[in-house]
UniProtKB/Swiss-Prot annotation:
Belongs to the LolB family. Plays a critical role in the incorporation of lipoproteins in the outer membrane after they are released by the LolA protein. It is found in: Cell outer membrane. Residues 1-17 form the signal peptide. This is Outer-membrane lipoprotein LolB. Keywords: Cell outer membrane, Chaperone, Lipoprotein, Membrane, Palmitate, Protein transport, Signal, Transport. The lineage of its organism: Bacteria, Pseudomonadati, Pseudomonadota, Gammaproteobacteria, Pseudomonadales. Disulfide bonds: none annotated. PROSITE patterns: PROKAR_LIPOPROTEIN. The keyword Chaperone applies. It comes from Pseudomonas fluorescens (strain SBW25). GO terms for cellular component: cell outer membrane. NCBIfam families: lolB (TIGR00548).
Length: 205
């Protein structure tokens, strides 16, 4: 179903703001923990970006893919989806406290959070607000996480709140090493994100 695909893709929009990091992570793997801390501190300063890429979702009874445009400006987001989904396009916009999803030829849906919107429309409970961190190659700071670092002291895998995130490749853009290909594995749901163009920004407080 197109609407189901759109809403699942929309959880890329999570947007909980950029709070500080806690000390709730367990780190292992090849990398150097001190270098990882430096890398993490650098990425945490990114509070805006423009992303273009592709996203795919696979569930037991559903699958789909499409193109993704994601504009983030601190706590505001504008996410647009189109492509081989079969029936037009969708746009998700919002700030904390209000989320709006417009689907071509189907209508407008609103909620107070991405999580609420997802649960209202298809009945799934997912940690969607984590993705604003995961897409930058960071663990979300508000729950425990288990990290494995690669030889460059960047995330190789991340386990958090019942999800496993695999970082398959990175790209350097504007002095930042950012995820290029990400796979997310959760209960009965797999998501693949391939980022073709990263434009990170530091917008300030």
């Amino acid at each position: 179903m197109f609407l189901r695909h759109v809403i699942v893709f929309s959880f890329i929009a999570l947007l909980a703001g950029c709070a500080g990091f806690g000390s709730r992570e367990s780190v292992e793997g090849q990398g150097n923990p001190a270098q990882w801390q430096q890398h993490k501190d650098q990425l945490s300063s990114i509070d805006g970006w423009q992303i273009e890429g592709k996203v795919g979702v696979r569930a037991p009874k559903d699958s789909g893919s499409g193109t993704l445009f994601w504009l983030q400006r601190q706590d505001y987001y504008d996410i647009r989806l189109s492509g081989p989904l079969g029936r037009g396009a969708a746009r998700l916009t919002g700030r904390p406290g209000h989320v709006s999803l417009e689907v071509a030829n189907q209508g407008r849906y609103e909620a107070t959070s991405p999580e609420e919107l997802l649960e209202q429309q298809i009945g799934w409970k997912l940690p969607v607000s984590h993705l604003v961190w995961w897409v930058r190659g960071l663990p979300a700071p508000d729950s425990k996480s288990r990290l494995s670092l690669n030889g460059d002291s960047r995330l190789s895998t991340l386990e958090q709140d019942g999800w496993q995130v695999e970082y398959l490749s990175y790209v350097e853009q504007s002095g930042y090493w950012l995820p290029e290909r990400i796979k997310l594995h959760g209960p009965d749901l797999d998501v693949t994100l391939v980022i073709k163009d990263w434009q990170p920004r530091k917008l300030g407080q």
